[in-house]
UniProtKB/Swiss-Prot annotation:
Disruption phenotype: Morpholino knockdown results in reduced caspa activity and impairs caspa activity in response to bacterial infection with S.typhimurium. In addition, larvae have increased susceptibility to the bacterium S.typhimurium. InterPro entries: Ankyrin_rpt, Ankyrin_rpt-contain_sf, CARD, DEATH-like_dom_sf, Multifunctional_ANK_Repeat. SUPFAM superfamilies: Ankyrin repeat, DEATH domain. The lineage of its organism: Eukaryota, Metazoa, Chordata, Craniata, Vertebrata. Residues 127-146 are annotated as: Disordered. Induction: Up-regulated in response to bacterial infection with S.typhimurium. Highly expressed in macrophages when infected with S.typhimurium. This is CARD- and ANK-domain containing inflammasome adapter protein. The gene is caiap. GO terms for cellular component: cytoplasm.
Length: 744
């Protein structure tokens, strides 16, 4: 049956003949594998053998090998229903092929085309047991029950005689008995003649059966091939003969055991050694039984395999060794066996170990790293151990050659990394190993800066105890106290101040720690600094005090604390803005109220003559504007800046309709003129704010908007609107014309 020139091919033979087309044509191997498992052809654990491969064609090739080893029935189910569902076009191509090479169908139970036609007609798959193949008959016998019973009885006696011939090693008798018999006949328990010959270790009979076309991949009821039987019994010569003839060393039974598994667990080391030797000859970059042992954490099997010549660093299709699989699955026992046997430890394996973050597994590598890894790889492992705060691993790596002061591509040393992450246990080990504590990052961050930033008081205390200056300067001249203030760490600040940190150091931008705590809204840090008598009047490069920053951020509690500590509520910065200007501009109503309660001047002017009300009006901050107006009892409602603009000009120009209404209700002059003799109505028309224009021209509670007022270029509000080019300007023009009775 091994010939490729026949007219009635079996499913196995179709796979063999069309192997290359199937390997390249199966596009969804994972889907097909799911179907094969669902239909009982393959066991779920077979998925590991296929899924470990990354190349689709390699997956397909291995899947076909496994199918062939499962026998004819498995190959039939592969075609129908599995291939038909997963790859319908490829199935149709195969069906057309087997139909074309068959001119006549004589036995639909055995020929693939008959099987496919039958199943296509039925539309479903029926589970069937492997059929018993009877001795060939030369005469046409009538199909009647009594005669069938006679045949079965005769057949039973015949089979008993065959088994006796095999068990006794009587080759001559076997030749006589099998003249009219298919050598692949299924006997009891799905056993073939080859199964029995292999189990009894009859080498000569095995060779005879192989010459007669005995199939190597047929399985018994336990899913075992003839090679399984030979290996289980320790028949080394027979096992080697079968392996050399092409038997799959990696075929698995129903318990996922290969022949090597069975030989090893039964103590047949000679057989193990021979099969390992055959495996090494036939495999290149494929999964070995040692890989399987690593995945299963079968340390005993791994020991036997290695003792009998298995290559400890053999790579599979993904270029992974058995050690890599053992580590990836967290299988410490097998990993220990592999390491003891000299398995190479590379960076990928160390990465896999760190992914599990299991200290006991990582410790297995430590005595091997110096021999197996480069200095760069050992140093990289040290950084990983520091990152995970594995103190014992850090110590062991340093003892085995890792450079405690190594620097990675980002400029970190292990000390700097531990400080930044706040990993105190790893840091203590590094200090005990005499690591340098005064190294800096490229941006000038010191280990103390990083410890403060991470909030690790433990690390900060160690550094200060070791003599690191608490006033050490970092990026932009920031001290550790600046960072602790920025990150709201009052306990850290207390530690730094206790050991002599300066209370009011300034950065390149002129910021003190109090500035940074105030602008970040850190109430606790501000309280800590004020308790230490920090300078509330200190100004940064913009001339701002801490109160300016608290006001701009709307931090009411900090504003109140600063005022209580003596901060000047009317302090002016470089542009003459007071904290009240900044709070009003941002619309922080409660902050405005707090500052006013602290005697802030509502009419204070900046360098452009703008009051806090100007800022509120420009930015549309209605509530803040209302608070300011109420505080001054509207006395400052018409204050003008250097361009003689009132708050109403700014509110109108920016289209803040509601605020325009508030200002008008507080007696703002509706026709006030700026330096260009523009009224608020001119400003609203120029910027195209229709709602604001409506609010102004419809105001009737007091002085009304002068529609005829002209500015210094002799244009009234209508003419200003007509100069605009937007739809809003057109609508304003129409509105004004109607208001002026120029149109109906």
């Amino acid at each position: 049956m091994g010939s490729t020139s026949f007219t009635n091919p079996y499913a196995i033979e179709v796979i063999q003949m069309k192997r290359s087309e199937l390997v390249s044509g199966i596009l969804n191997p994972e889907d097909l594998l799911d179907l094969l498992i669902a239909n009982g052809v393959l066991q779920p654990d077979i998925r590991v053998l296929v899924s470990d491969l990354t190349v689709r064609e390699e997956k397909n090739s291995r899947m076909l090998n496994i199918l062939i080893s499962r026998g004819e029935r498995a190959c039939r189910i592969f075609f129908y229903p599995c291939l038909k569902r997963a790859e319908p076009d490829l199935y149709q191509h195969m069906r057309t092929y087997v139909g074309g090479v068959n001119e006549g169908i004589r036995d639909a139970r055995r020929q693939l085309i008959g099987y496919l036609l039958e199943k296509d007609k039925q539309g479903l798959v029926k589970n069937s047991k492997p059929e018993r193949i009877h001795p060939k008959s030369t005469a046409n016998e009538p199909n009647n029950e009594p005669l069938n019973k006679q045949i079965l009885k005769s057949e039973s006696n015949h089979h008993d005689a065959i088994l006796e011939a095999i068990s006794s090693g009587d080759l001559y008798l076997l030749q006589e008995l099998t003249k009219e018999l298919d050598v692949n006949s299924v006997l009891s328990s799905n056993d073939t003649l080859l199964h029995h010959a292999a189990e009894y270790g009859k080498e000569a009979i095995v060779y005879f059966l192989l010459r007669q076309g005995a199939k190597l991949d047929l399985k018994d009821k336990e899913g075992r091939t003839a090679l399984h039987r030979a290996a289980q019994r320790g028949h080394t010569a027979v096992a080697v003969a079968l392996a050399k003839a092409g038997a799959d060393i990696h075929a698995t039974d129903q318990t996922s055991k290969t022949p090597l598994h069975l030989a090893a667990q039964n103590g047949h080391e000679g057989c193990v050694k021979a099969l390992v030797h055959e495996e090494k000859k036939s495999l290149k970059n494929q999964t070995t039984v040692l890989h399987m042992a690593a995945i299963e954490d079968n340390a005993t099997l791994a020991e036997v395999l290695l003792r009998n010549g298995a290559l400890v660093d053999a790579q599979d299709g993904q270029r992974k060794t058995a050690l890599h699989h053992a580590v990836r699955h967290g299988n410490e026992k097998t990993a220990a066996v592999l390491l003891k046997a000299g398995a190479q430890v590379d960076s990928r394996i160390v990465d896999a170990a760190f992914q599990l973050n299991r200290k006991s597994l990582l410790s297995l590598f430590l005595q091997h790293v110096h021999e197996s890894m480069s200095q760069t790889e050992i140093n990289a492992a040290l950084f990983k151990a520091v990152q995970r705060n594995l103190d014992a691993v850090v110590a062991a790596l340093i003892e085995h050659g890792a450079d405690v002061n190594s620097c990675n591509e980002l400029g970190y040393t292990p000390v700097l990394l531990a400080a930044e992450l706040g990993n105190g246990e790893a840091f203590k080990v590094l200090v005990s190993k005499k690591a340098k504590l005064d190294e800096r990052l490229p941006n000038q961050m010191s280990s103390l800066h990083l410890a403060v930033q991470s909030g690790s008081i433990q690390i900060a205390q160690i550094l200060l105890h070791k003599g690191i200056d608490p006033n050490i300067s970092g990026p932009k001249d920031q001290t550790p106290l600046h960072l602790s203030a920025s990150h709201n760490q009052p306990a850290m600040m207390a530690l730094l101040l206790r050991v002599g940190a300066q209370l009011n150091p300034v950065t390149q931008d002129g910021f003190t720690p109090l500035h940074l705590a105030s602008q970040n809204g850190h109430t606790e840090a501000v309280a800590q600094l004020l308790e230490a008598k920090a300078d509330v009047h200190a100004k940064d490069k913009q001339g701002r005090t801490a109160l300016h920053w608290a006001a701009e951020q709307g931090e009411v509690a900090i504003i109140q604390s600063l005022l209580a500590a003596g901060a000047y509520s009317n302090a002016s910065e470089r542009e003459k803005k007071t904290p009240l200007h900044l709070a009003a501009a941002e619309g922080h109503t409660k902050a405005v109220s707090a500052l006013l309660a602290g005697k802030a001047k509502v009419g204070a002017k900046d360098m452009d003559g703008c009051s806090p009300l100007h800022y509120a009006a420009r930015n549309g901050k209605e509530r803040a504007g209302s608070v300011l107006l109420a505080s001054s009892k509207s006395k400052n409602v018409d204050d003008k800046n250097v361009w003689r603009r009132t708050a109403l000009h700014l509110a109108a120009e920016h289209g803040h309709e509601a605020l325009v209404g508030i200002l008008l209700e507080n007696k703002a002059k509706i026709n006030a003129l700026d330096n260009n003799k523009d009224t608020p109505l001119h400003c609203a028309c120029k910027t195209g704010h229709l709602g604001t224009v409506q609010r102004l021209i419809n105001w009737t509670n007091g002085e009304r908007a002068n529609l005829q007022a002209t500015n210094n270029v002799k244009k009234n509000a209508l003419q200003v609107a007509e100069a605009g080019d937007t739809e809003a300007h057109e609508n304003i023009s129409t509105l004004l014309k109607k208001k002026m009775f120029l149109v109906k």
